[in-house]
């Protein structure tokens, strides 16, 4: 399979050195991400396009390549093509006929040709000649330039002809690694996950910073969604997941700060802590998922007060986005199900919160706060490479594993729904239920507690983690299923 990758249009208007830098970085990213699927993948480049070629023919691998390219920042779109040496125009007709003859009968169609190099014909000459011949030879209903049923696409570059099979949409944006790094404050809800995606889509590397207010289950949930976002949209770069224990900070706020100012003070403490983490990582930009007036702490006066707690630039990609649009985008990018089952703690600590907090009052409230507690939280912060975050969580987790399921037991397939659909689990004589890992903790208590459940995932890592959590919650009817 051969693909022609079209770069983000804004890259093409950069100066030659910058343009080369960005395209070189994009090629590097493509090799990094696709090497998992094909160790011999070939990626070559020209001035405004990259060519990707694999000799593998496994449909699942080829689909995986297309899916990964469609989720890679820096790509406007990519074409699946068949390449031939350029002959005369009759030869071009013959090559197009090979690919479109079965599709054209009864269709209104057009021909589109893009050309680069020196030739004795123009792109329009090709379109007219090929269109006329295909109409006569393939039983097409006619030619329609404005709203055709089918478009015959090709590209000619010097002495190479590319007949286009299909076109796939990319994310746009700049290649990750070509621009600056950011630190995204992650709660795991709709807003923070979509904000992280928007930043990555534009081409900024996103490290993840989580303030743990809710214990192990919340931390696990945020790690899972952060890993999902990175794996799907940013795995060309290695980034960090930072977890800061904030329970004691929250406790100090609850004890010392006036109830109506708790939300603003908590956000200011988070920005202070995030700034310290960013300094450690040499990052100048923080990212949050706040939108104007979505909650009391996000009014313009309060956002201004919150920003005053740091000298870092604070980006808010969703600042003017409606909530339903955020939810819709979360559904589109795959984080909505994670968010629906994620506990949200920041919004429940204030009663009658101030929507127009005053600086002098906020500073007075913060004087009651023991800043040593914030320093201690930062000292206990954990930094883990995002690609190892789930493995590190499962380390030293001792859970009973079984290689065979018995009659009466239930296997819970906790894989992502995509994996469940692509490779359904089948164990003769044993009941299998599907319950994605991100919904397991919230829905397990509704299951029949008289039955024994065996958690299953591909590598056993997620199943061990969730089994450990369920056991710690008092559910003794949980094991891990690891077929031999």
UniProtKB/Swiss-Prot annotation:
EC annotation from Swiss-Prot or TrEMBL: 2.8.1.4
Active site: 457
PROSITE patterns: RHODANESE_3 (PS50206), THUMP (PS51165)
Reactions accelerated catalytically: [ThiI sulfur-carrier protein]-S-sulfanyl-L-cysteine + a uridine in tRNA + 2 reduced [2Fe-2S]-[ferredoxin] + ATP + H(+) = [ThiI sulfur-carrier protein]-L-cysteine + a 4-thiouridine in tRNA + 2 oxidized [2Fe-2S]-[ferredoxin] + AMP + diphosphate; [ThiS sulfur-carrier protein]-C-terminal Gly-Gly-AMP + S-sulfanyl-L-cysteinyl-[cysteine desulfurase] + AH2 = [ThiS sulfur-carrier protein]-C-terminal-Gly-aminoethanethioate + L-cysteinyl-[cysteine desulfurase] + A + AMP + 2 H(+)
Subcellular location: Cytoplasm
One cellular component (GO) term of this entry: cytosol
Name recorded for this polypeptide: tRNA sulfurtransferase
Predominant location category: cytoplasm
Binding positions for ATP per the UniProt entry: 185-186, 267, 289, 298
Domain of life: Bacteria
Keyword Transmembrane helix found: no
Gene Ontology BP, a term: thiamine biosynthetic process
Broad EC category: transferase
Function according to Swiss-Prot or TrEMBL: Catalyzes the ATP-dependent transfer of a sulfur to tRNA to produce 4-thiouridine in position 8 of tRNAs, which functions as a near-UV photosensor. Also catalyzes the transfer of sulfur to the sulfur carrier protein ThiS, forming ThiS-thiocarboxylate. This is a step in the synthesis of thiazole, in the thiamine biosynthesis pathway. The sulfur is donated as persulfide by IscS.
Record keywords, A-Z: ATP-binding, Cytoplasm, Disulfide bond, Nucleotide-binding, Redox-active center, RNA-binding, Thiamine biosynthesis, Transferase, tRNA-binding
InterPro entries on file: Rhodanese-like_dom (IPR001763), Rhodanese-like_dom_sf (IPR036873), Rossmann-like_a/b/a_fold (IPR014729), ThiI_AANH (IPR020536), ThiI_fer (IPR054173), ThiI_N (IPR049961), THII_Thiazole_biosynth_dom (IPR026340), THUMP_dom (IPR004114)
Listed SMART domains: THUMP
């Amino acid at each position: 399979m051969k693909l022609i990758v079209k770069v983000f249009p804004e890259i093409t208007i950069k100066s030659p050195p910058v343009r080369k830098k960005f395209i070189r970085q994009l090629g590097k990213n493509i090799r990094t991400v696709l090497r998992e699927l094909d160790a011999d993948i070939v990626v070559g480049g020209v001035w405004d396009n990259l060519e990707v070629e694999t000799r593998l023919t496994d449909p699942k691998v080829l689909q995986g390549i297309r899916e990964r390219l469609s989720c890679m920042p820096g790509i406007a779109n990519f074409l699946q093509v068949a390449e031939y040496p350029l002959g005369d125009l009759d030869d071009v007709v013959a090559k197009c006929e090979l690919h479109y003859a079965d599709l054209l009968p009864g269709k209104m169609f057009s021909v589109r040709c893009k050309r680069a190099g020196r030739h004795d014909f123009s792109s329009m000459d090709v379109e007219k000649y090929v269109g006329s011949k295909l109409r006569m030879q393939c039983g097409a209903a006619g030619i329609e330039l404005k709203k055709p049923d089918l478009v015959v696409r090709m590209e000619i570059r010097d002495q190479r002809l590319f007949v286009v099979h299909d076109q796939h949409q990319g994310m746009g944006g700049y290649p990750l690694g070509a621009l600056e790094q950011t630190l995204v404050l992650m709660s795991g809800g709709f807003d923070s996950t979509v904000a992280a995606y928007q930043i990555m889509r534009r081409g900024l590397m996103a490290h993840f910073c989580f303030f743990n207010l809710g214990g192990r289950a919340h931390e696990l949930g945020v790690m899972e969604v952060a890993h999902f976002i990175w794996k799907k949209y940013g795995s060309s770069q290695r980034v960090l997941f930072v977890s800061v224990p904030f329970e004691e900070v929250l406790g100090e706020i609850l004890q010392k700060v006036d109830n109506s100012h708790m939300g603003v003070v908590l956000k200011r403490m988070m920005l202070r802590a995030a700034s310290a983490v960013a300094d450690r990582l040499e990052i100048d930009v923080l990212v949050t998922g706040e939108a104007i007036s979505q909650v009391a702490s996000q009014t313009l006066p309060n956002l201004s007060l919150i920003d005053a707690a740091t000298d870092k630039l604070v980006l808010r990609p969703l600042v003017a986005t409606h909530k339903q649009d955020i939810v819709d985008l979360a559904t589109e990018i795959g984080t909505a199900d994670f968010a629906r089952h994620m506990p949200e703690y920041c919004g429940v600590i204030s009663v009658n919160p101030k929507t127009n907090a005053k600086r002098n009052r906020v500073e007075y409230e913060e004087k009651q706060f023991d800043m040593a507690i914030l320093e201690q939280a930062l000292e206990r912060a954990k930094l883990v490479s995002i690609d190892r975050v789930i493995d590190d969580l499962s380390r030293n987790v001792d859970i009973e594993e079984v290689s065979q399921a018995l009659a009466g037991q239930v296997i819970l397939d906790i894989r992502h729904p995509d994996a469940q659909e692509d490779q359904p689990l089948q164990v003769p004589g044993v009941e299998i239920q599907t319950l994605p890992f991100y919904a397991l903790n919230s829905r397990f208590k509704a299951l029949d507690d008289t039955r024994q459940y065996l958690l299953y995932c591909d590598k056993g890592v997620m199943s061990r983690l969730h089994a450990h959590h369920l056991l710690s919650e008092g559910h003794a009817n949980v094991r891990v299923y690891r077929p031999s």
